[in-house]
């Protein structure tokens, strides 16, 4: 027997599994809305013209040192250009900008995932936080990254499934009441993945003030600078606000060039740790500790991709061309949102679809049930995540009407039935969940629970429960199988009622004791 004979199976990454299934599908009308990569109106990858020109220039120079080692921290020219782009120093050539630069430790990473991981590893080792707060929902890889560094996470409300809006009140009230000094709060700078919903400038100010008042550590994931509005300076607004208006607190930023330069496979990113004004003398020490972690993992970031980024950012002609390329991508996605909304409206598809045009960036939560998503895949060959997150760049002028009609026709499919879930090892549903209590924020979607179930779990969808005040809510009930009876049952508020209409109480539902649910549902 192998030494790994007792190794538990794990659930494969949903996005990559869907992409593999899409590539194996030979249906002529198949549509891929799962992968977070930009596609042109012809449905093909679009190498940015600015990137192609940069590659031509680099190749023509035939630099014999192009493939040599740089430094553990990374290429100095790339890091300076990346830092200036992220923190807006291009427009701040004065004494204040010079002073702010001295507070920032920057290192090159293996794209945005590597920046998130390095930051999580560094903070877990030296700040030793008790909790990291993640938005509900968030990018799925955030859970894995923080699990690997053994920092428990809790969720703050972010998305209201009842109307497809940003749940600012739920976020603020939860963090105000439950977050503790020293906790990390993970924020996405723009084009929130997966919801496509961003705070307004005033809401960002309120969030920053809460971090200041509660002594929370902001960790900003900036994977889509330029994708939200087509303007890099607009999309890094919260980063610049923290830097300039909250100089007395530390923060960090994970930066990626995968999306905004289309360098998905080149893995180009940076991690920036921003010291407060009193700690700026520690910058080199912070860099040394980051380099120690880098040396033990990947030694240095890839050179080929960072050379391209450096050339684009430092060449005025290419930089201007790149800005135009980003605007083209951003505006096409906006046009596809409107086209999908217009067709659903024309078809008189039940429900409100205005959230599709109100969301920004690459992704949208369409608002379909898992059963409807499955129907889209099996009957119409349209691939999107079970949460109904869709990459809007997968839409184009030749398939948007087909997708809209398919969505319209899936409204006839209810979301019922028993079915087993695949075994999954690892963490419980919510780290820090107290026994006998389940948190049910208004608007919680079903996907928030199935993604992190214990091993050997079954679930029943859309179980109606009449509360003491007479309000009926629809719950997904999760309970262990006979082989795992030691695990307690969990519930999650369903996002769709049986006929496809939202079923929520008129007042925000915050907590329900499991003892009440046990008695009602006879679990």
From Swiss-Prot:
Origin superkingdom: Eukaryota
Gene name as annotated: ucdG
Database matches in InterPro entries: Aminotransferase_I/II_large, Asp_trans, NHTrfase_class1_PyrdxlP-BS, PyrdxlP-dep_Trfase, PyrdxlP-dep_Trfase_major, PyrdxlP-dep_Trfase_small
Phenotype on disruption: Lieds to a slightly decreased formation of usterphenyllins and uscandidusins in Aspergillus nidulans.
Any single Gene Ontology cellular-component annotation: cytosol
Subcellular location as annotated: Cytoplasm
Coarse class of the protein's main subcellular location: cytoplasm
Subunit architecture: Homodimer.
Alphabetical UniProt keywords: Aminotransferase, Cytoplasm, Pyridoxal phosphate, Transferase
GO biological process: aspartate biosynthetic process
Cofactor: pyridoxal 5'-phosphate
GO terms of molecular function: L-aspartate:2-oxoglutarate aminotransferase activity; L-tyrosine-2-oxoglutarate transaminase activity; pyridoxal phosphate binding
PANTHER family listed in its UniProt record: ASPARTATE AMINOTRANSFERASE
Family: Belongs to the class-I pyridoxal-phosphate-dependent aminotransferase family.
Pathway(s) this gene product operates in, as recorded in its UniProt entry: Secondary metabolite biosynthesis
Reaction(s) this enzyme catalyzes, per UniProt: L-tyrosine + 2-oxoglutarate = 3-(4-hydroxyphenyl)pyruvate + L-glutamate
Name of this protein: L-tyrosine:2-oxoglutarate aminotransferase ucdG
Summary of the function given for this chain in its UniProt record: Nonribosomal peptide synthetase that mediates the biosynthesis of usterphenyllins and uscandidusins, p-terphenyl derivatives. Within the pathway, ucdG is probably involved in the conversion of L-tyrosine into 4-hydroxyphenylpyruvate (HPPA) as a precursor for the usterphenyllin and uscandidusin biosynthesis. The pathway begin with the biosynthesis of 4-hydroxyphenylpyruvate (HPPA) from L-tyrosine, possibly by the aminotransferase ucdG.
Enzyme Commission number(s) from the entry: 2.6.1.5
Pfam families in the record: Aminotran_1_2
PROSITE patterns linked to this entry: AA_TRANSFER_CLASS_1
The keyword Cytoplasm appears for this protein: yes
């Amino acid at each position: 027997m192998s030494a790994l004979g007792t190794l538990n199976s794990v659930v494969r990454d949903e996005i990559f599994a869907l992409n593999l299934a899409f590539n194996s599908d030979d249906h002529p009308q198949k549509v891929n809305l799962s992968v977070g990569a930009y596609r042109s109106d012809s449905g093909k990858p679009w190498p940015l013209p600015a990137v192609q020109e940069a590659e031509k220039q680099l190749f023509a120079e035939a630099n014999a040192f192009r493939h040599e080692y740089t430094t553990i921290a990374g290429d100095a020219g790339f890091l300076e250009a990346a830092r200036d782009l992220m923190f807006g120093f291009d427009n701040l050539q004065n004494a204040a900008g010079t002073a702010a630069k001295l507070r920032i430790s920057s290192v090159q990473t293996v794209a945005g995932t590597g920046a998130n991981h390095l930051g999580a590893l560094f903070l877990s080792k030296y700040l030793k936080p008790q909790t990291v707060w993640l938005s509900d929902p968030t990018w799925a890889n955030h859970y894995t990254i923080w699990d690997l560094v053994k920092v428990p996470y809790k969720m703050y409300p972010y998305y209201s499934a009842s109307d497809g809006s940003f749940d600012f009140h739920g976020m603020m009230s939860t963090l105000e009441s439950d977050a503790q000094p020293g906790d990390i709060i993970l924020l996405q700078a723009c084009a929130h993945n997966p919801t496509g919903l961003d705070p307004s400038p005033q809401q960002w100010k309120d969030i920053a003030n809460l971090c200041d008042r509660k002594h929370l550590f902001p960790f900003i994931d900036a994977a889509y600078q330029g994708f939200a509005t087509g303007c890099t300076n607009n999309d890094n607004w919260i980063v610049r606000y923290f830097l300039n208006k909250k100089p007395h607190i530390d923060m960090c930023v994970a930066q990626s060039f995968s999306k905004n330069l289309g360098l998905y496979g080149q893995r180009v990113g940076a991690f920036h740790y921003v010291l407060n004004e009193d700690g700026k003398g520690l910058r080199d020490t912070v860099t040394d500790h980051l380099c120690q972690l880098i040396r033990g993992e990947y030694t240095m970031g890839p050179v080929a991709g960072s050379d391209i980024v450096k050339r684009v950012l430092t060449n005025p002609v290419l930089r201007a061309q790149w800005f135009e390329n980003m605007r083209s991508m951003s505006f096409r996605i906006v046009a596809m949102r409107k086209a999908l909304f217009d067709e659903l409206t024309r078809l008189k598809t039940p429900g409100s679809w205005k959230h599709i045009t109100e969301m920004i960036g690459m992704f949208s939560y369409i608002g379909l049930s898992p059963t409807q998503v499955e129907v889209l895949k099996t009957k119409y060959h349209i691939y999107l995540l079970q949460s109904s997150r869709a990459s809007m760049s997968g839409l184009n002028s030749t398939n948007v009407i087909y997708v809209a009609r398919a969505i319209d026709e899936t409204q006839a499919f209810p979301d019922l039935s028993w079915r087993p879930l695949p075994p999954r090892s690892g963490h419980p549903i919510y780290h820090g969940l107290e026994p006998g209590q389940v948190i049910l924020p208004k608007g919680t979607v079903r996907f928030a629970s199935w993604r992190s179930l214990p091993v050997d779990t079954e679930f029943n969808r859309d179980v109606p429960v009449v509360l003491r005040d007479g309000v009926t809510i629809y719950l997904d009930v999760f309970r262990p199988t006979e082989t795992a009876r030691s695990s307690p049952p969990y519930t999650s508020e369903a996002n769709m009622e049986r006929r496809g209409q939202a079923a929520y109480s008129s007042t925000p539902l915050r907590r329900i004791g499991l003892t009440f649910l046990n008695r009602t549902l006879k679990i």
